[in-house]
Amino acid sequence: FKNCVAEIKRNVIERIFTGATGGTLDVIIDRHYYDDKGAYLLPSSFQQEMLGRIVEECKKRDLSLILYNAPVSTEYMERVPSSYRELTDSLAREYVDDKTVFYLNYTAVSLPDSCYRDADHLNEIGIHRFTPLLKDTLTCLGVISE
């Protein structure tokens, strides 16, 4: 489990420093949902298994787990394959118990284009507009206190 977390961190850091984030909407969608040959990618069985292990580990340790989808631009959301959205929603709901595992899906939050750095990342303006909503939600769930 620790090796998996280290690998994920290494991959995320590498992507940030090599510029493998951002780009045009076409580039972003292709990177997230299609392989090099243009074939559609679903979450892998490995990803699904690791999610299950994370949920189990959090429950064992009596930790709250928040499965979270950040706000994205309308254009981005329109391009996400519906089968991907349905599968990720289904996987998340499979684990939600509203006591320790929560699913916060903010992809439908409507923010103006001025709030986005690119199609799937908020900029500073967006962060300042969105953070109070997230804080209120976490407070209502009892995950954080005011």
Which sequence ranges carry the predicted segments?
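Long, positively charged, glycine-interspersed low-complexity recognition regions
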Residues: M77-E146
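Generic detector of short, locally flexible boundary/turn motifs and exposed helical patches
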Residues: I29-Y34, Y68-P71, A92
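Active-site segments of SGNH/GDSL-like serine hydrolases
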Residues: V55-V80
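Secreted/periplasmic serine-hydrolase-like ester/acetyl group-modifying domain
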Residues: F1-R61
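Membrane-targeting and insertion segments and their boundary/processing signals
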Residues: T24-I28, D62, I66, T100-A108
